[in-house]
Amino acid sequence: MNKRTISSLIKCFVLLILLLPTWLAWDVSPAQADYILVTTPFDPAPDGCTVSHCSLREAIILANETPTTLDQIYLPTNTYHIERSGNDDTSVLGDFDITSPIEIYGIEDTPSSVVRIEGNQLDRVFEVTGSNGDLWLERVTITEGNQPLYNGGGVACYHATLTLEDVVIVLNSSPTHYGGGLAADHCTVTISNTNITNNTASDGGGIFANVSTQSLINSIVYYNHASEVGGGIYTSNSDIAFYAVTLGDNDAGTRGGGVFQIGTTSSLFIDHSLVSENHAKAEDGGGLQISEGTNLTIVNSTISANVADTFGGGISTSIPTTINHSTIVNNHADMNANNDGYGGGVLAYIGSGVTISNTILANNTDHSAFHYNDCAEYVGVDVISNGYNLVESVGNCTFNSTGDKKGLDPMLGPLQNNGGWTNTHALLIGSPAIDAGNPSVTRIQFPNSDQRGPARYARVINGQVDIGAFEAWLVTFLPVIFR
């Protein structure tokens, strides 16, 4: 049996244990350390898990003694504090060091109960290291971590593997380094059904990734802050993929309010996602600042209401970029109106080649004298239309391909919950984007649903796809004949 199957079989047994008096001890010896129940929220000097006492720190130390064997640790509803300050790599002091395969599960007594693990501002909460380091976290909140000397205020991963499932990472900080919530260096990271919020760092307020692979699925990265670059995410020479992600309300002191990307081998793939209300306070890329990399791909997604004080309110990209079936609206560039930047919606900058199809570019604002509201090309850079775009204000870009519509109001609803995984701008009745997309796109072709995701939000209705990230469901009223 794999570890997921084993986990399911033992959960019923663990719940029976919890029906016994609170903090009843479970005898766990090093020879039988596959499943460990933590019995105290306190963090004393570790002296081993015994019949009467097992702390989270002691459970982790015990699990690390078998570096190639999977151990599962269960945490009943409570708040677990780091109380032992210091710096080592053995979990005796400071953060909890993971050097072997470990799964940690919070056991919530009620739907409203929370399992919290707090750093107490003494250190980050978890550090996952080494070739055997493999941490699976599920149903826990990581908070109050602080690491002023190194990367990763809440969680750090170095040359290891990390999985977050149904986790909240909130109010952690790395004030002079990278990754307020999470820092990954040479790691494989999977983040699912997780909120990363209100974390702070010098760079990468929510997440920092260096030479890593990260997948974010059905997760939220919002209200994070970087004093320099990458309010939500800072990525360097890493492969990042979003699916059903909301990246919103993050801010950076200079560039990349939502995402800042550098590194010649970096790539970013955004699908069925929302990038909204991020702010680059002094420079470029309100939503996305893509400075280096191999490619940027945006499909079935919305880039809305982001702000850059200079270039590229929604997107500023300097690498090959493909945008398809997306909606880019209500973004702002050169917010100070001092002619220090331009490109309200999309800016194709030095080194890029941007290809756009089946996409709405509208209601963006370039506050400079250039007024390149929806699209801007830097000198010597081309934005290529592959057709079936609706662009209200073309700026200095050219949209003359088959199916392109120019100078039209797309007639969008507000950004709100219209069903599905992320907020969207609905197409209102009478929108010129309805049934105006590429007719060769059929129901069975990719993408097979609009941004909202589930199959009930089909990508093609009435026989022809709509332009943008949202597919309108329109009701046809037949005339009633009275006799």
Feature names for model-found ranges:
Residues 2-14:
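Bacterial N-terminal signal peptides that target proteins for export
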Residues 12-25:
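Bacterial N-terminal signal peptides
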Residues 26-151, 157-159, 163-165, 339-340, ...:
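N-terminal, post-signal-peptide segments of secreted/periplasmic proteins
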Residues 72, 161-166, 184-196, 207-223, ...:
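Predominantly extracellular beta-rich ligand-binding scaffolds that present long acidic/polar faces
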Residues 123-125, 152, 179, 204, ...:
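Conserved positions at the start
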Residues 147, 168-170, 174:
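Leucine-rich, hydrophobic repeat-scaffold detector
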Residues 479:
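Conserved functional hotspot residues at active sites or interaction interfaces
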Residues 482-483:
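Short, solvent-exposed mixed-charge patches
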